Amino acid sequence: SDVYKRQPLIAAGGIASGKAMLAAMILGAEGVQIGSRFAVATESSAHPNFKQQVWKTPEGGTMLALKKIAPTRLIKNEFYEQVKTLEDQGADSDTLKELLGKGRAKQGIFEGNLAEGELEIGQIASMLKGEESVAEIMQDLLRDYNQSINRCSNSVSF
């Protein structure tokens, strides 16, 4: 339809490599949004404690929570456990908003409170192992993207 041709499609979520960028483009995206990898970049204003926690997060160390408000992926910590307990008990959105209304994201991400703060990060957290500058991230993404294109073009035949 003409409506879809006029609107750019941007893929987001789970994209941390050039290979994932290419996959999104092959599926029709015109661009990608990369959040988590840049959230812990050298230039990021995130607290060093938050960055360290992200780099230590194992596969399966994040969970989707706050589904009644806005689905949010969190690193498992004391705050996450409070949210999970309330959700398991059937808490309504007002109760969850009250818990969030205490500046939890600021506490966790920007003040480095790893226990009581909201530690929001994407599901690719376990892939992130150390600090990189934005320039290094971009170079790696483009190198991997171009290598992936070359692999695809060299392996397709009819």
Language-model segments: which ranges?
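Conserved active-site-proximal phosphate/metal-binding subdomains
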Residues: 1, 5-10, 16-158
